[in-house]
From Swiss-Prot:
GO molecular function (one): FMN binding
Name this protein carries in UniProt: Uncharacterized protein DR_2585
Protein's organism: Deinococcus radiodurans (strain ATCC 13939 / DSM 20539 / JCM 16871 / CCUG 27074 / LMG 4051 / NBRC 15346 / NCIMB 9279 / VKM B-1422 / R1)
Reported cofactor(s): FMN
InterPro entries: Flavin_Rdtase-like_dom, Split_barrel_FMN-bd
The keyword Phosphoprotein appears for this protein: no
A Pfam family: Flavin_Reduct
S-S pairs: none
Family indicated by similarity: Belongs to the flavoredoxin family.
Length: 227
């Protein structure tokens, strides 16, 4: 099967965005909550979704998301608030919350409280002072550890200090077993408002090298017996 190659270094930003967001899918959605303090205190609480997001490790537990910058090159409210206070929350988005999450991406004026405008109820944090979306099936409490800027790409790394999980998704709290399907999370597909469910799943067991050798040898012996 043939492939088409795109030289991204020779393409404008709009083309790179279209190609990559349509290819790197599905992407989990970070519904990021922040609160201004000090010089940015006037910004108040901000709630915004980002699909340039992922879990980066567990020792320490780290997530990363990329809020980028505004069209005029200035930081978005999320980045400004985190830069001043360091704390933020990531509410994960279920199918039931997808519509209101999408509304929170509206280009509200700087400093406008999206949660208040949209009637989104918030729940207080335990390890951080920033609230999270009360109806979210899961939420992460984070503290910024590093922000990396590459051109107009701004990547915020946050250590996860606390995790909220809806009770019906916790199968065994002592053994830390989670019913992932019960979270009913959605992901981003492409860059123009297309989303996906996470309900259609399949499992593949991880093999040890010894198990792989055994299977490979059995297959080789089967191939020879057919000749």
């Amino acid at each position: 099967m043939s492939h088409t190659h795109f030289d991204l270094t020779a393409l404008p930003q709009s083309a790179r965005y279209k190609l990559l967001t349509a290819t790197v899918v599905p992407r989990p959605i970070a519904w990021v909550g922040t609160r201004g303090s000090g010089e940015t205190g006037k910004l108040g609480f901000n709630l915004a979704p980002y699909s340039f997001f992922g879990l980066m490790g567990s020792e320490p537990p780290v997530v990363a998301f990329a809020p980028g910058d505004r069209a005029d090159g200035t930081p978005k409210d999320s980045a400004l608030n985190i830069g001043s206070g360091g704390e933020f929350t990531v509410s994960l988005v279920s199918a039931a919350l997808a519509a209101v999450m999408n509304l929170s991406a509206t280009d509200f004026p700087r400093g406008m409280d999206e949660a208040q405008a949209l009637g989104i109820q918030l729940a207080p944090g335990r390890r951080v002072q920033v609230p999270h979306v009360a109806a979210a099936p899961a939420a992460l409490e984070c503290r910024e550890v590093q922000t990396v800027s590459i051109g107009r790409t701004r990547i915020i790394l946050g250590e996860v200090l606390g995790l909220w999980l809806r009770e019906d998704a916790v199968l065994d709290a002592e053994k830390h077993h989670v019913d992932t399907a019960a979270l009913d999370l959605v992901g981003r597909m492409g860059g123009r408002g297309t989303y996906t469910h996470t309900r259609d799943t399949f499992e593949l067991g991880r093999l040890t090298y010894a198990q792989w050798q055994e299977q490979w040898q059995a297959r080789e012996e089967g191939d020879h017996s057919e000749k």
